[in-house]
Amino acid sequence: MVLHSHQLTYAGIAFALCLHHLISAIEVPLDSNIQSELPQPPTITKQSVKDYIVDPRDNIFIECEAKGNPVPTFSWTRNGKFFNVAKDPKVSMRRRSGTLVIDFHGGGRPDDYEGEYQCFARNDYGTALSSKIHLQVSRSPLWPKEKVDVIEVDEGAPLSLQCNPPPGLPPPVIFWMSSSMEPIHQDKRVSQGQNGDLYFSNVMLQDAQTDYSCNARFHFTHTIQQKNPYTLKVKTKKPHNETSLRNHTDMYSARGVTETTPSFMYPYGTSSSQMVLRGVDLLLECIASGVPAPDIMWYKKGGELPAGKTKLENFNKALRISNVSEEDSGEYFCLASNKMGSIRHTISVRVKAAPYWLDEPQNLILAPGEDGRLVCRANGNPKPSIQWLVNGEPIEGSPPNPSREVAGDTIVFRDTQIGSSAVYQCNASNEHGYLLANAFVSVLDVPPRILAPRNQLIKVIQYNRTRLDCPFFGSPIPTLRWFKNGQGNMLDGGNYKAHENGSLEMSMARKEDQGIYTCVATNILGKVEAQVRLEVKDPTRIVRGPEDQVVKRGSMPRLHCRVKHDPTLKLTVTWLKDDAPLYIGNRMKKEDDGLTIYGVAEKDQGDYTCVASTELDKDSAKAYLTVLAIPANRLRDLPKERPDRPRDLELSDLAERSVKLTWIPGDDNNSPITDYIVQFEEDRFQPGTWHNHSRYPGNVNSALLSLSPYVNYQFRVIAVNDVGSSLPSMPSERYQTSGARPEINPTGVQGAGTQKNNMEITWTPLNATQAYGPNLRYIVRWRRRDPRGSWYNETVKAPRHVVWNTPIYVPYEIKVQAENDFGRAPEPETYIGYSGEDYPKAAPTDVRIRVLNSTAIALTWTRVHLDTIQGQLKEYRAYFWRDSSLLKNLWVSKKRQYVSFPGDRNRGIVSRLFPYSNYKLEMVVTNGRGDGPRSEVKEFPTPEGVPSSPRYLRIRQPNLESINLEWDHPEHPNGVLTGYNLRYQASCLSSPVNGSKTGRTLVENFSPNQTRFTVQRTDPISRYRFFLRARTQVGDGEVIVEESPALLNEATPTPASTWLPPPTTELTPAATIATTTTTATPTTETPPTEIPTTAIPTTTTTTTTTAASTVASTTTTAERAAAATTKQELATNGSSIWDIRAWANSNWANITWSHNYSAGTDFVVKYITSNKTEKSIPVKAQTPSSVQLANLTPGMVYKLWVFPIWSSPSEHSYITFTTSSAYTKNHVDIATQGWFIGLMCAIALLVLILLIVCFIKRSRGGKYPVRDNKDEHLNPEDKNVEDGSFDYRSLESDEDNKPLPNSQTSLDGTIKQQESDDSLVDYGEGGEGQFNEDGSFIGQYTVKKDKEETEGNESSEATSPVNAIYSLA
């Protein structure tokens, strides 16, 4: 065997044997086999402490453990007398142990067992004793009752409050608190002494604000006892003034307290003495009084305080010296001082000592005829006396032994013989304590033994120091010699050094030191030898290690690590990065002589360490790798695309089960290739279908592919980067592998019946890479699940086989084995299947129904017997249907429903029933075939419930003062309706920032027959939210919620012209089209045109370009036009976006656009407000492309971009639009304003003057060229001009399009004036005047002028008197 770490253990044993040999003693090695064979006197291994205090509430355990051969027996003495354990039923002794157990569970007083116990362990070779164990029961006596009077004390006087705690075992811990259980604050003026008393150096007036109670905490019982509290009454010369005390620099003089020099309260006088035992802690204490409170300092006469052992405690009033020794004796003094003076107290410290060991006697093992000695030296103060015992008895009273001589603290043995074994006790004692030690003397004669394993193999690296170990044992102690290769010369000297512990050391192992070494151990009883084979190995060295490198990101650095090592040792090469194990991922490749990193990144920078190790040694080499990052500005503007396809696939290294595939990578298109996917296609099972074969890092261009037998392979490669996957490469040439027998069998084998007399066996067939050969087929075997049954088999090619004429639902054992022309697959697994099921023969009985609530019932039934199921029980089913409603004339659906209760159970719950209805129910049991017979039909009613919501709630606003509500009854009343409950509340828009304000909730209750209600508005701008519920006597039903329509004066968004410019024409990026329509009559808001949109949950802002005209009307409504651009910048592939349009209202906008990108392209809509608030909204692919932007800011100007999600917007390709202003209550009727009435009167007067001038000119015979346009009129119903230069949209009502009063329509559509041609009645009415005779020119002129203006502005306005006046002007 090979010995490495064990060498140290054996060397330690051999060294111990050698040491004891020098003092004529033998140490028995820690070998269980040897120790079990050698006789050994008893030795105490575990015992309780000398002063043993126990808890009276627990059982008592007094420990005593010992070892020896034979196993010792135990006995006890109590108070010096034999303690008979067998006579006391409460006392027992543990098996193979001397530990006493005193059990009080059955009663008894622990105090009765107090005393001094000692344990005796005996065997054939002697008796060992434990120390005397003083057993005491813990006590926590009560505090003596006493009356504590009020203590009167002058302010500034000293005071001590005595505690006098009851004596406990062990002594209690003392602390002071008030009666309200608050700790007493302690400082250098007020502190607790070592005796538990509370000392006041001087009393202050605030000391009387609390009382003082001494508390004692007892450790074992975990109890706290409290003394009656002290109450102080402080007599003072001046009344208490807190303000003056805070402002005064000396509170004592401020209070009129006389300042005094210090005096000692404890200890008294100027000197005292204290005795302490060696090894314990010494605590010296000085407490002084005085005004102000004095400071305490400590000194030692004639020297410094012991360094490293002293500690000041209790505000310097106590000095603790740890682990006192004789050197700490002397005089210590404490100095108490304040500004009035100082005083000193001297404490004389005397250190005594209980006995302590100088030389504790040790076990002595001797050979027959050898000499030895036991030494027992102890010290103490006073000096202890030494007493020897043998086997527990005084040595003076033991039988005489001529080979033994007692000389004070030493026993000398000469010429010992077999049979002289015994256990000796040494007792060292003085007035402060005692020590007891056991040491046995054992006389052994043992032939030599080699303790090391036989035929060891030691491997060592050349030129290293090594040592061959040969631990041995014997009595007398044997002598040991070393030989090499059976030569007679003893090895000692030169390169070899033999140690007495049996080790042979070589200062430098060389190749010629290899060989077989023999160690021979000899004593008078015999001789024994063992062989050790030494092999010298070559060292492990890194001949070429990694070097520091500086590389660019994305490159492929290689770190070298070439190792030379002994070929007979296994080499392991590991890599560390920054002194931590390196994880070798798919970007790294570890080889025998180095490490390659593909696509190195900044995170790869650091220290790399190559560690080459064998079982004997190791070597390492380190290098630092620096990675230079490519500047970001070099790649930022480069467009990233999917990589180009790999090309030029080539097959090489053709082998039976592998092939090497090589390819040339395509362009990565500015995104590094991260992976290559190799796919294959075969032409036998699934021709034309490609399967993934393997995946490789993006920095390789070849791969060794593992192949399956009998597959005609064809390969292709796909490159992958962060953008996506490339197109597949062109396929490689085909490669056919040879065949073999299948190695696996089909999986997923199942057996189940499709009819009651068959079983269909199915499985997952082998694929092309698993067939391994031609003519793949399957051997199907089956038999009844009976070890004695016969197997049936069938060979098939399809992945199924049907077995007929089977009993109903019996288990079968099934095996399916694959086979081809090269042979069969290994023996298949056995699966369990079942033949077909038949319908169950019995129905559940004793079906009972308990109604839980209006929609649920609880069912119980008696289960069917398992023999009647004829298959696997799947579930119990409860079929139920609604037979009728308890409401008259209410039609109900009688559709049958069922609830399943899986498994073998007899109870369940049916829920989701309609309340207030009659139901019928029947039950069946179901297996895999279907339902069994039905049980008896049960009928039950459901109680009344709450109704569903009303079918609808319609809201109409006939005017600004009221809202009409109309609703319908609930579809499911679920009981007798008792009425309706309507809750509603108003909300008005306060500001774009603060949102809406909600008013209080109003409640209305209606009878069950009422379905209409009118709400009177409190103001015309509020919107209302309505909550309507129907009600039965059970309670309110489901709610229907509706909100009143939008405000009446909000603009109605209407799309602008749908005209698209030619594709070759591009507008400026901010080009917009705006149309304005002016109406002369009030209009009612209409819903916006429905456009397919994507809901946007976030708050956004948009605007649109508008134009408006002011006319003489009661209400003016501005219609928003669509902002549009014909085309954005072209993408790299020629695709583009055009015709971006925005239909905007005050707080939302519909956005549409056209594009020729591929289907499935997602877009981003980005918009920025005039105050630079930016939002981006992703839009999923849809047709047509549109999105709705909600929660915009009224009156805000927006810039908007649309671009593909994988792209970024062009800086100039945007449109702008503006949202309309919000409605305010400051709108007034313009027709009632004084300035407007005055303006209209002035215009009428001006028209009259102009008409008079015209008539005067006519009367003078002027002629005008108006005959050609005599019958032409610009009617609001006229169509657009044919060139499509503008689009006219009228918002006028039908009344506006009718002929004016006193007019008629001609056959050609013109309007003929019936009255006088120069009549101005129509103008007085605000209508359109017409002059149709030759002298009538105003209408013709006005129409022509309006037409010209309309064509120039690409907008249309209704003809009005204002236009006519402007035309004439």
UniProtKB/Swiss-Prot annotation:
Residues 1-25 form the signal peptide. Residues 1257-1369 are cytoplasmic. This is Neurofascin. Residues 645-740, 745-838, 843-945, 949-1057, 1133-1222 form the Fibronectin type-III domain. CDD domains: FN3, Ig3_L1-CAM_like, IgI_hNeurofascin_like. The chain crosses the membrane at residues 1236-1256. Keywords: Cell adhesion, Cell membrane, Disulfide bond, Glycoprotein, Immunoglobulin domain, Membrane, Repeat, Signal, Transmembrane, Transmembrane helix. Residues 730-739, 1300-1313 have a biased composition (Polar residues). The keyword Glycoprotein applies. GO terms for molecular function: cell-cell adhesion mediator activity. The gene is NFASC. Its main location: membrane. The keyword Secreted does not apply. Gene3D superfamilies: Immunoglobulins (2.60.40.10). GO terms for biological process: axon guidance; dendrite self-avoidance; homophilic cell adhesion via plasma membrane adhesion molecules. SUPFAM superfamilies: Fibronectin type III (SSF49265), Immunoglobulin (SSF48726).
